[in-house]
Amino acid sequence: MKRKFVYLYLLGLLLFSVACTGNFRDYNTDLSGITDDDLIIDDNGYGIRLGIIQQGIYFNYDYGKGKNWPFQLIQNLNADMFSGYMHDGKPLNGGSHNSDYNMQDGWNSAMWTHMYSYIFPQIYQSENATRNTHPALFGITKILKVEAMHRVTDYYGPIIYKNFANAEKHYRPDKQEDVYYEFFNELDSAVVALTGYIEEKPESNGFARFDILLDGKYPSWVKFANSLRLRLAMRIASVAPDKARAEIQKIKENDYGFFEAETGGAVVSTKSGYTNPLGELNRVWNETYMSANMESILVGYNDPRLGIYFELCTDETLKGQYRGIRQGTCFAHSHYSGLSKLFVKQSTDAPLMTASEVWFLRAEAALRGWTDEDEETCYQNGVTTSFHQWGIYGVEDYLQSERKASDFIDTYDEENNIEARCKVSPKWNPLDDKETKLEKIITQKWIAMFPEGCEAWAEQRRTGYPRLFPVRFNHSRNGSIDTEIMVRRLNFPGTLQTEDPEQYSALVEALGGNDHGGTRLWWDTGNNNLE
């Protein structure tokens, strides 16, 4: 009881301190009064920091201003929508907003402000606290750092990373290329720290009571590092293939492997008191609905995951159907309120990486000739693992299916109707060209990663797959976002232009293009460069 009281007391103080360090320039202004000795009690300080970081990736902890709404701005009204997964069902902002590329700065800046205000300071402090004394926790911190911050650079491009706490270098931002190369260095450090500790203390599981992503076992964290390295290596496959292959070679030389089984993966557990913010938006706020893309592909494929991912329409005229909303429809009515909502509840674990995703990454690596694995086997294992993850068996018929996506028919306005864009079926054909094979791999990976929109949006931008419907209306400023090419990134927070113009100029310079949603990121080449 005493330990629990101390833990909760320190957690409250630490959350307060995080809320007081809003600007990354003032990251070290800790007003909590917590001493290093306080944080050492039962290792609570280390666990509390890592707990905050774990809750801050799929963001949902209360730093004093409530829960759930930060996630809506950080992810749901951006990546979850741009990925082709979801759409809001209410006329937010009068019906015109990010959906039709009338980009809202308050929404677009949320990832930046929350990560730099509340998560990166804890990462920095955890690194310093564990570097020389707690190698396993240091390794875990590094993995969480990469998992958290790759989502930030995948939104914006250049970020403040290596110089986050470096006043002498004026917190100079890094180009995305440099950030990614540093990610790989961070994962190197993590693997060395963890594997060394495991060899020294193979039975140790001291982090288990703080672990809300994995099973508390350190070998699982090495698997996470390897799987994350593979994800990031494939992200740069088109722009830096030699570096990508070199990183994959490192994984081959590691004995711990990847996430493979349907029970493997990194998910934020709700058994710890964490609640899924998407579930709150979905079940309580009634603001998340199936997208037209999900309807087109899942209904067209007769995919058995359809009834697990989404609920049937509540509109009596659409009884027994799964129907979605097309992005960019600009509606100021409630006619879509009876369409299909998500299955996600507040108690649903929040996925960050699944074993099925890793199988599809392995399929692409094999397709590119970078491993000696069989691309078809990896592809089929990816589909099978996804099915089993949701308790679905009998995948054989699906893997032989030649069904295609269906046309989208709007339930209210026929002007929103559009022919199916996705032209591939689930069945693998060894005679297909490499581009068609890649489209099948990424389309199935997109289905399997649901509802994790950050990764889905990043991969859709990188590869162009699945082929999504263009927005019905495009209200981007000065036509900065092309309707067919679609939104490529989020702009930097608008407040930087007035509050820190020097920093803003440095970020735009590192971007190498205009600060709007039409500018491609470093890894977004527009060509998959399949040899």
Describe each region flagged by the PLM.
Residues 62-73, 158-159, 245, 453-458:
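Beta-strand acidic-aromatic groove motif in beta-rich domains, primarily in extracellular
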Residues 60-105:
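TM-lumen/periplasm interface segments of multi-pass membrane proteins
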Residues 387, 391-531:
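C-terminal functional modules
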Residues 88-396, 431-436:
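Structured, solvent-exposed acidic/aromatic patches
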Residues 1-29:
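Bacterial Sec-dependent N-terminal signal peptides
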